[in-house]
From Swiss-Prot:
Cofactor(s) this protein requires: Zn(2+)
GN (gene name): pyrI
Any Gene Ontology CC annotation: aspartate carbamoyltransferase complex
Assembly behavior: Contains catalytic and regulatory chains.
GO BP terms in the entry: 'de novo' pyrimidine nucleobase biosynthetic process; pyrimidine nucleotide biosynthetic process
Protein name: Aspartate carbamoyltransferase regulatory chain
Species per Swiss-Prot/TrEMBL record: Methanospirillum hungatei JF-1 (strain ATCC 27890 / DSM 864 / NBRC 100397 / JF-1)
Function noted in UniProt: Involved in allosteric regulation of aspartate carbamoyltransferase.
């Protein structure tokens, strides 16, 4: 008998091709799924692990999506709710690309302006445009500020 702690393993099946989103803030995996438009009727095989022990964070969430690689705009949206996330591209069971997410300084067509009178919320064909100032997003058209609950403004 030893004093060593038993080894703990995370058992989520590996994927052959697709994307693994790791180091999501604990409790945000379902928000990430919503951002990606993944619902119960989605055709992709999706694995979700929540509140998993982590060395880098106390707890984390992980999302694995078979046969799908994320678009840049999807990664930008994920960065808003999971700024420490890592995106792993998997091909033939191997990680071929691994990168952290970065919140871009300007977000176009990613957030909905909270100002109902903003030109982006009218019938005009204008995409929203926000500049990031720390954790605040400022509308480039009307100067409305989103400083909390940014995930509820993601388009």
């Amino acid at each position: 008998m030893t004093n060593e702690e038993p080894k703990r393993t995370l058992v989520i099946s590996t994927i052959e091709n697709g994307t693994v989103i790791d180091h999501i803030k604990a409790g945000e995996a379902l928000t990430v799924l919503r951002i990606l438009g993944i619902t119960g009727s989605t055709r992709e095989c999706v694995s979700v692990a929540t509140n998993v022990s982590s060395k880098a964070q106390e707890k984390k969430d992980v999302v694995k999506i078979e046969k799908r690689e994320l678009k840049a705009q999807e990664v930008d949206r994920i960065a808003l709710v999971a700024p420490n996330a890592t995106i792993n591209i998997i091909r033939n069971f191997r990680v071929i690309e691994k990168k952290g997410v970065i919140i871009p300084p300007v977000l176009i067509g990613v957030l909905r302006c909270p100002n109902p009178c903003c030109i982006t919320n009218t019938n005009e064909p204008v995409m929203s445009r926000f500049e990031m100032h720390g954790k605040k997003a400022v509308c480039s058209y009307c100067d409305a500020v989103i400083s909390s609950d940014i995930s509820s403004h993601i388009i």
